């Protein structure tokens, strides 16, 4: 009858291999790379609109992808508009036109009015 396969002995608690993975040579822990996302801002808006509602991490991931996608579309369209008009700067006018082109009907109107309100608030606070 064959003998059962023996597993490798478990590494000791203070082994050198475990130490090098978690810590650098000078004894400091490695800094985790920061992953940028819009989750803080999505959460703030959610609490403004529905204070008693939460959001799952999966839903937050979807919202983050959505915001990134819309941002890229608006930036791309605004860039094309600036290029067509032989301009090297994207201004609020290009952004506004890009939003009007990308978003349908009533949604575009609301987005433009909220954007105008935000720009006015920003310029008045300077």
From Swiss-Prot:
**ADP-ribosyl glutamic acid found at:** 3
List residues modified as N6-lactoyllysine. Answer: 6, 12, 16-17, 21, 24, 44, 86, 109, 117, 121
Q: Which residues carry this modification: ADP-ribosylserine?
A: 7
Q: Name the residues that span the membrane.
A: none
Task: Kindly list the positions at which Phosphoserine occurs in this protein.
Answer: 15, 37
Q: Which residues carry this modification: N6,N6-dimethyllysine?
A: 58
| Sequence segments annotated as region (Disordered) | 1-36
Q: What does this protein do?
A: Core component of nucleosome. Nucleosomes wrap and compact DNA into chromatin, limiting DNA accessibility to the cellular machineries which require DNA as a template. Histones thereby play a central role in transcription regulation, DNA repair, DNA replication and chromosomal stability. DNA accessibility is regulated via a complex set of post-translational modifications of histones, also called histone code, and nucleosome remodeling.
Protein name per the record: Histone H2B type 1-H
**Which species does the entry assign this protein to?**
Mus musculus
């Amino acid at each position: 009858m064959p003998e059962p396969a023996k597993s490798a002995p478990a590494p000791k608690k203070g082994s050198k291999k475990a130490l090098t993975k978690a810590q650098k040579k000078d004894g400091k822990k490695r800094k985790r790379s920061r992953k940028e996302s819009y989750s803080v801002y999505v959460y703030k808006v959610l609490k403004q609109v529905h204070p008693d509602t939460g959001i799952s991490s999966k839903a937050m991931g979807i919202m983050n992808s959505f915001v990134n996608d819309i941002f890229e579309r608006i930036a791309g369209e605004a860039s094309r508009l600036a290029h067509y008009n032989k301009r090297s700067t994207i201004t609020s006018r290009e952004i506004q036109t890009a939003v009007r082109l990308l978003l349908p009907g009533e949604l575009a109107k609301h987005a433009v009015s909220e954007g105008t309100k935000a720009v006015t608030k920003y310029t008045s606070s300077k």
